[in-house]
Amino acid sequence: MKRFLLPFVMMLVFSAESIFTDLVHFPFVTDDQVLAPRFLMLVLIFMSAFINQKHAMIYGFIFGFLYDMNYTSLLGVYMFGFAGLCYLASKAFKVLHTNAFVVILIAVLAVCLLEFYVFGIQSLIHKDIMTFNGFVLDRFIPTILLNIAAALILVLPFRLFFMSLKKELRDE
């Protein structure tokens, strides 16, 4: 039964990003600053840490494609970004321990890499999209702070969920 629960949970996380963006407004964030929740990226990194690389890359590819279809005009940016970062994170987890601190650190690093990757692709296509300083001050720093807080909140519930799912997958 938990096998069908994973796609449902991932769809909820996918939907939670846009709901969070629409409904949550912080008083200390100016109108110029952008808080981009990357909950899906965090959960995919948690999946690569606690289940396995194959599941994380498949879900990263599928949900990256859905992300591209819903939020961008360019197909493939998030699709390959999510899957590639899941691959890199799983290789890092083979070397490092998968305790909560290391998982949070790698997840936040993956969000950093994703933000710079997307900014790089967008700045190649649209030359006048945003300056690098504007990107760092108005988008990157608020996004990273939000995702650090989200990673701290989400790591333990998803660790328990993924560990029980991994046990059930192993038993089958």
Swiss-Prot record:
GO annotations of cellular component type: plasma membrane
Chain ranges passing through the membrane: 4-24, 33-53, 57-77, 101-121, 143-163
Bilayer topology annotation: Multi-pass membrane protein
Entry keywords, A to Z: Cell membrane, Cell shape, Membrane, Transmembrane, Transmembrane helix
Location of this chain's protein in the cell: Cell membrane
Major site of localization recorded for this protein: membrane
Pfam annotation, one family: MreD
GO biological process, one term: regulation of cell shape
Coiled-coil spans in chain: none
Entries under InterPro entries matching the protein: Cell_shape_determining_MreD
Purpose of the protein: Involved in formation of the rod shape of the cell. May also contribute to regulation of formation of penicillin-binding proteins.
Family, as annotated: Belongs to the MreD family.
NCBIfam families per record: shape_MreD
Name of the molecule in the record: Rod shape-determining protein MreD
Organism classification: Bacteria, Bacillati, Bacillota, Bacilli, Bacillales
Encoding gene per record: mreD
